[in-house]
Amino acid sequence: MRHTEEKRLAWALTGSGHYLRECLDIINQLQDVDLFLSKAAAEILQQYGYRHSVGRVFQDKTASSVPVELFYAGRYHTLVVAPATSNTVAKMVAGISDNLVTNLYAQAGKTRVASIVFACDTEPELESEAPRDNIVKVYPRRIDLENMEKLKTFEETTVAGDMLQLHSAIQDRLACLKISSS
C-alpha cells in the first residue's frame, strides 16, 4: 500500500449538467486528481462544450470497469462523485454496480476509501443548467429525495447538498489527510 501523500483523489462525473461547470472549476483547481467519466458524462461534456485540465482520464469503455482495480492498488484516498444523477444515487443505494461510476463507489466502500457525493436532486424544487446556457426548473421526485437521504446513512460516505457543502467536504477531507500524514 502506498503512503497517503502519494495517493490521489478520484473524481467521477455522471451524465448530469446540474452544476457541472462548477464541479469542473473545482476539479481544475485540485492537484493529484484523476477523472472518471461515465458514458453519459463524456456525452454531456461535449454537448455543453465544457473542458477540463485533468491529465489522467478514464472512460467507461469496458464491461468490467477495469479502472476500479486502481482502488485495490491503494492509489486513491478519496472518491468524489459530482454531479451524481438520481439514477446513479439510486443504484448506489440499491448496491447496483453496473457501470464505471457505480463500480467505483462500490469498490471505494469495499476498500474503505472515503466517498463524497454531490447528489443533483437535493430539494423539492431546483434550478438547473441545461445545454446552451438555459436554466430550467426541476422538481425531483419523492423517490429521488428519499434515495439521497438513504445515501447519507452509508458508511464512509458524505453527501453534499450544494456546491458550498461539496467544496467544504473536499477541503475538510484534504485537510484531514494532511494532518494524518504529518
Pin down the residues of each PLM region:
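A cross-family phosphate/adenosyl-ligand binding-site feature
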Residues: 1-182
